[in-house]
């Protein structure tokens, strides 16, 4: 017994088995059909109520004019349905050519690899095969020349088409055709049996505008062919698979514009509630646990912070109370007259702290100088070592530089005391600056006139010319004005009390600040006269 008798029947058949069964079924149908069934139209006169529908109803003829119905014999005039389905093609062995899908829209000469054997390298059986040899120089030159000519022709056609005016195309050479007419005889074709016709291309006007519209959109070329699938063809789906792939229609729970009556089971199937089981993700539990832990830690942190704040407040309170107790103790000791050595020790400690602070500032200043930029460092060092003298003259060196302590010589060898220097002790008299300070001519020139050497770099050699330039001089002067006078030298000099204002203020102070001194003296005179009269 064969092994196949024990095995169950296969649920799916291969393509070869399906084709074999189809051939056997067709042979059985030919053998069983004894009489050929052929449909023919009814004879003339018996066609009442008969309407031709199929191609067999027309037989070998055309339409029936007595039947007023749209008829399409041999499908002539019928609108054909547009479809991108390909016709099934078979090879020499009768197998379906599936590579037609990849060859769709491609040229017939294009090589498309769509078989499994295309992936397997071929074995070279004969190394001397001329197809496997490299071309020689002549073949390379010939192919190169053909390629160049084809490219030049394509480029020249595109360039000529883009030109608004172009030269007339060269006419093709004349062609001679031997023509034999169908009507032979003396009365036809002047008795000649054959004629030789010369075909010449019609002359074309180069300035003629185009006759046809060519601005239509050119359809896009075919895309790249799909990747070949190297597996067996698809098998027919079973009924179970078809039911599993059946998708229920989209039924809205809110809108029903057409007013259809939709069964409840279809509505629930479209809703999809019963198709999936409710499954709670475990991340919800993780999130809840994490939130609980975070809340507990936050509460613990808040409580700990509150305890620390309470402890700090308690320490501050205790420190404040201790300070108040010390202050009260010091006040009691001071009131009792008890001297302590704490103040002396505190003073010495404070002095040491000040010395430390000054040294720390000096070290910080030195570090800043070392870190500063070169220009800024030189500027700081220059300002640090700058000498401040009595002569306020920029750019003038100080001739008196000595390390000895200098004193004002005017304070020595004075025969009078303190009351002689300031008007006998009168504070209200303002005579401190009654004499000029360093009234020498050289001193005034140095202070109030810039140095020539310093300003020469800025202004050049024409400094004197600029100083002597008469600026802000009116065109017409007042009468009596003389601008040829010699300019002053030195600082501005003021006259001493030209209006007698100081004298007026002294008189006002002597009268005690009263507004009417005459009125205040009158009652005393009257009172004195009255006393004299009483005595008399």
From Swiss-Prot:
| Numbered residues of crosslink Glycyl lysine isopeptide (Lys-Gly) (interchain with G-Cter in SUMO2) | 23, 81, 97, 115, 122, 141, 158, 170, 193, 240, 258, 286, 339, 344, 416, 441, 452, 509
Q: Which portions of the sequence form the region SNW?
A: 174-339
Principal localization?
A: nucleus
Q: Where in the cell is it found?
A: Nucleus
Which residue intervals make up region (Disordered)? 1-46, 209-233, 311-386, 472-536
Look up the record and give one Gene Ontology term from the biological process aspect: cellular response to retinoic acid
According to the record, the signal peptide region is: none
Q: What top-level branch of life does the organism fall under?
A: Eukaryota
Q: Name one GO molecular function term.
A: transcription coactivator activity
Q: Where is the composition biased (Basic and acidic residues)?
A: 472-489, 503-530
Q: Which residues form a coiled coil?
A: none
Q: Does the keyword Transcription apply?
A: yes
Tell me which PANTHER family the record gives: NUCLEAR PROTEIN SKIP-RELATED (PTHR12096)
Function comment: Involved in pre-mRNA splicing as component of the spliceosome. As a component of the minor spliceosome, involved in the splicing of U12-type introns in pre-mRNAs. Required in the specific splicing of CDKN1A pre-mRNA; the function probably involves the recruitment of U2AF2 to the mRNA. May recruit PPIL1 to the spliceosome. May be involved in cyclin-D1/CCND1 mRNA stability through the SNARP complex which associates with both the 3'end of the CCND1 gene and its mRNA. Involved in transcriptional regulation.
Q: What is this protein called?
A: SNW domain-containing protein 1
From what organism does this protein derive? Bos taurus
Please name the gene that encodes this protein. SNW1
């Amino acid at each position: 017994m064969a092994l196949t008798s024990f095995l169950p029947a296969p649920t799916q058949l291969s393509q070869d088995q399906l084709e074999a069964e189809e051939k056997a079924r067709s042979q059985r149908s030919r053998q069983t059909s004894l009489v050929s069934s052929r449909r023919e139209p009814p004879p003339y006169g018996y066609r009442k109520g008969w309407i031709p529908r199929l191609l067999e109803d027309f037989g070998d003829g055309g339409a029936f004019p007595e039947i007023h119905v749209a008829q399409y014999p041999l499908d002539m005039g019928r609108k054909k349905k547009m479809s991108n389905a390909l016709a099934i093609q078979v090879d020499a062995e009768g197998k379906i050519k599936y590579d037609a899908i990849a060859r769709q829209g491609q040229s017939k000469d294009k090589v498309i690899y769509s078989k499994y054997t295309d992936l397997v390298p071929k074995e070279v059986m004969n190394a001397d095969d001329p197809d496997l040899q490299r071309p020689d120089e002549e073949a390379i030159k010939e192919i190169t020349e053909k390629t160049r000519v084809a490219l030049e022709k394509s480029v020249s056609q595109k360039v000529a088409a883009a030109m608004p005016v172009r030269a007339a195309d060269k006419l093709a050479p004349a062609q001679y055709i031997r023509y034999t007419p169908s009507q032979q005889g003396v009365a036809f074709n002047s008795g000649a049996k054959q004629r030789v016709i010369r075909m010449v291309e019609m002359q074309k006007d180069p300035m003629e505008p185009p006759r046809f519209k060519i601005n239509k959109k050119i359809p896009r070329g075919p895309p790249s062919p799909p990747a070949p699938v190297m597996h067996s063809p698809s098998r027919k789906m079973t009924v179970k698979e078809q039911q599993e792939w059946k998708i229920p229609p989209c039924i809205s729970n809110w809108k029903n514009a057409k007013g259809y009556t939709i069964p409840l089971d279809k509505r629930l199937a479209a809703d999809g509630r019963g198709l999936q089981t409710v499954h709670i993700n475990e991340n919800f539990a993780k999130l809840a646990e994490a939130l609980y832990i975070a809340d507990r830690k936050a509460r613990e942190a808040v409580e700990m912070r509150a305890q620390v704040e309470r402890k700090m407040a308690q320490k501050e309170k205790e420190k404040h109370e201790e300070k108040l107790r010390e202050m009260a103790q010091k006040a009691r000791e001071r009131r009792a007259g008890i001297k302590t050595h704490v103040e002396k020790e505190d003073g010495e400690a404070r002095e040491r702290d000040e010395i430390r602070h000054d040294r720390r500032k000096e070290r910080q200043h030195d570090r800043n100088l070392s870190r500063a930029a070169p220009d800024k460092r030189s500027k700081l060092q220059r300002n640090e070592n700058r000498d401040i003298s009595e002569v306020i003259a920029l750019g003038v060196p100080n001739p008196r530089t000595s390390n000895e302590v200098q004193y004002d010589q005017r304070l020595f060898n004075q025969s009078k005391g303190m009351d002689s220097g300031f008007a006998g002790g009168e504070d209200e008299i303002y005579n401190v600056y009654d004499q000029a300070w360093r009234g020498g001519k050289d001193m005034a020139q140095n202070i109030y006139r810039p140095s020539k050497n310093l300003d020469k770099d800025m202004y050049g050699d024409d400094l004197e010319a600029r100083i002597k330039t008469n600026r802000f001089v009116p065109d017409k002067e007042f009468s009596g004005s003389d601008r040829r006078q010699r300019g002053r030298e030195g600082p501005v000099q003021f006259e001493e009390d030209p209006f007698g204002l100081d004298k007026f203020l002294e008189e006002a102070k002597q009268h005690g600040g009263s507004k009417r001194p005459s009125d205040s003296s009158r009652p005393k005179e009257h009172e004195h006269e009255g006393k004299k009269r009483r005595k008399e």
